[in-house]
């Protein structure tokens, strides 16, 4: 099964739980893609003492998950040049289907 997760929030708990779900699905053998849009493109900067989001993101990508982000949203939120975004594919306004 293919699973798509859209993250439109910059609430640390919400984003952390979305990536936890993504990690679970990847471990179950599902093909999973996360699409960051709107405030969701801020995900890498939302770590707190309780919610280690970048750790969840790293596990997700290392497990085979894919992360894409709205390029326009990255620009609006001034996040286009971050070196930490090595694992985020830039997309237009909508994600494309993952190759088979």
Q: Where are the regions that the model predicts?
A:
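Low-complexity intrinsically disordered segments
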Residues: 96-98
């Amino acid at each position: 099964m293919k699973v798509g997760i859209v993250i439109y929030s910059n609430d640390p708990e919400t984003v952390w739980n979305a990536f936890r779900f993504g990690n679970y699905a990847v471990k179950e053998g599902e093909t999973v893609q996360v699409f960051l849009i709107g405030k969701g493109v801020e995900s890498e900067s939302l770590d707190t003492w309780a919610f280690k989001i970048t750790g969840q993101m790293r596990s997700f990508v290392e497990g085979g998950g894919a992360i894409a982000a709205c390029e326009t949203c990255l620009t609006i939120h001034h996040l286009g040049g971050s070196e930490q975004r090595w694992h985020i594919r830039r997309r237009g306004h909508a994600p494309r289907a993952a190759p088979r």
